[in-house]
Amino acid sequence: MSRATRRIRVRARLTAALALAALTTAWLTGCTASSPASPANGTKPELERFYDQRLAWKDCGDLRCARLTVPRDYAHPDNGETFVLPVAKAATADPGERIGSLVYNPGGPGASGVSDLAADGGEVFGAAVRARFDIVSFDPRGVGGSEPAVRCAEPDDGGGGDGGDDAQEPIAPRTAGDRSRAFAGARAEAAACVKGSRGILPHVGTDDAARDLDVLRAALGDRKLTYLGWSYGTSLGTSYAEQFPRRVRALVLDGAVDPSLGWSERALSQGKGFRRAVDDYAEHCADLAGDACPADGPQEMSDLLDGLYEEAARQPLPAGDDAYDVDARTLLDVVTDAMYSPEDSWGDLSEALGEAADGDAAKLAGMAADDEEPAGSHRTRGRARENDDEAILAVSCLDTPHPREARPYWDALAAADRAAGVYGTSSVVDELTCADWPAGTRRPHEVRAKGVPPVLVVGTTGDPATPYEEAESLAGQFPGGMLLTYEGRGHTAYGRGGSCVTRAVDAYLVDRRPVRADAAC
């Protein structure tokens, strides 16, 4: 996934602060106990102590919570260095009908699965699934309540503690001076994260997180894994299927990330996805936003947006005395964020754009502030500071090789500008920090998962962040892969795409019922 704040998204939640406080207490007091037998077949002897652990569950609000210990470096599991990962469970109400655990990842990378589960107790899942599975999630290594976690110190250039203020970067640095400043700022951001994370950055990649997922499977007592991943969670699930194909029971990947794409291809794919979504918004603004739509037609709406971008690039849009003025990057963040859930956001976006065009950007500034600390998402007050922005940077840079020199980024910038305008160029600029990042070992590749059972990929035709074409590609890369198409807008489908999607996914998860070749909702 691209790493700007606007690109991290999990499903909307209404979170209870008391439940989160209880979660924090449970993490601090939880422990693990050994079991006399390992549930994993073929486990290397040096990993047996991790696979043999049993989770010591404690009450935490309406959930049960525990901690899982995994090796920091799977190549050297006996060196004494570990990650301790928070785990949470919403137990099925009917233990007699229980199939096992359903583990899920809400996206990111960088989203706390524990906070996400605390927000609704697993209610996003269909009733048929909740009746047959314990719903389980966890904070991946380096994320959220993980000990240790990714942290970025303040860059030497004076940026913020989360690795820099990307709202001040030019969306498309075109002059030599702008490009030099952008590249220098990205290098400072990378150096700040290396300094603040104290040596853990080489160990927070998706392949290692997938190995943690297998340790969690064993600790839960499940012989095989039942899993659902949204957005980045599809990368985690794909990696698990490649490493442990015969330990998969059922795998749902919703909002697919295509592992065969390199960094520039992925940036271009996402840029095009947002461009299409914004064009769709311009075309249907009046239908969804009614009188709040500030333009009479698609071209007028596009012209209004382009005019605001140009104005904000020259001088931030005035938001009054009680808010920061809105520069071009902040405007872009607000617009793209609204593409994730049109049914919830397009009305507010339309009102904010109309008021900004009339000289008052206060509502835009308020939406930007909400995006920084959105009510009902994994960025929730009441627990230790989460590190989603830092983690999305760390995982994304480690997972995909990037060039060290600047020229390839400027070449990609030109191609993205032609294909997707500001939405493409911003995606490329987001990649700059990876130029100075510790190198990982992953390379773009098609899925290699011989022996995995049929995997269900869910794709949304109007998905801005994980375009539908990537779902088609990923489904085709799995042996026996199945594609369920949701003909709709917004990011991901299960939990927001209606009863048709829910029935198909639930039937697959519970009964492993396949979907037909042309399945669509």
Regions found by a protein language model. Give the residues of each.
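Gly/Pro-rich cap/lid or specificity-loop segments adjacent to the active site
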Residues: P36-T330, A394-C521
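Long, K/E/R/D-enriched contiguous segments that form extended
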Residues: E372-A375, A384-N387, D399-P401, P408
